[in-house]
Amino acid sequence: MQVQRQLKRDLDKANRYFNKHFTPPTVSYTVRGRKAGVAYLQQNEIRLNPILLSENSSNFVQQVVPHELAHLLVYQQFGQVQPHGKEWKMMMKEVLGVPAETYHCFDVTNVAGQQFPYRCGCQTHFLSIRRHNAIMQHKRSYICKKCKEILVLKVK
């Protein structure tokens, strides 16, 4: 319910600002992992992470919902532009009245997937299961940005 109320408030702001009627998006709760939310522009849909929402309800609703809605509003108003470009920043600040933040700071302990330790010449890196599997299947290799060495699975 909080999500729908926030969406309505923000849509009302955008409708008044642009003097037009934006189509309300559909909302689903199917995002997994560390992402808080995703906007699907052509489908006019916002997908949210239900675990992060339940663990951070008011902050999540006040930050993530306007963030994703701003992507949809920008697409409807300006077409295809940079995801966090000047139009999106303007939509966040001027229209919706919220800071134009591109990353959330929620605790992702309960949603983070399994991590695999890899080493290089200077440090240990933790890779996702997707990257780990790509390495194991000889489809990909990853290089440390600092020392430029190929990452190797750290044997315990």
Swiss-Prot record:
Free-text remark on how the cofactor is bound: Binds 1 zinc ion.
UniProt keyword annotation of Metal-binding present: yes
GO cellular component, one term: cytoplasm
Any Pfam family: SprT-like
Protein's cellular compartments: Cytoplasm
UniProt record, GO biological process: response to stress
Reported cofactor(s): Zn(2+)
Binding sites annotated in the UniProt record for Zn(2+): 67, 71
Entry annotation: catalytic residues: 68
Origin superkingdom: Bacteria
Entry keywords, A to Z: Cytoplasm, Metal-binding, Zinc
Principal location: cytoplasm
Molecular functions per Gene Ontology: zinc ion binding
Domain SprT-like, chain residue ranges per copy: 15-153
HAMAP family registered for this protein in UniProt: SprT
Similarity comment: Belongs to the SprT family.
Protein name in the entry: Protein SprT
Organism: Glaesserella parasuis serovar 5 (strain SH0165) (Haemophilus parasuis)
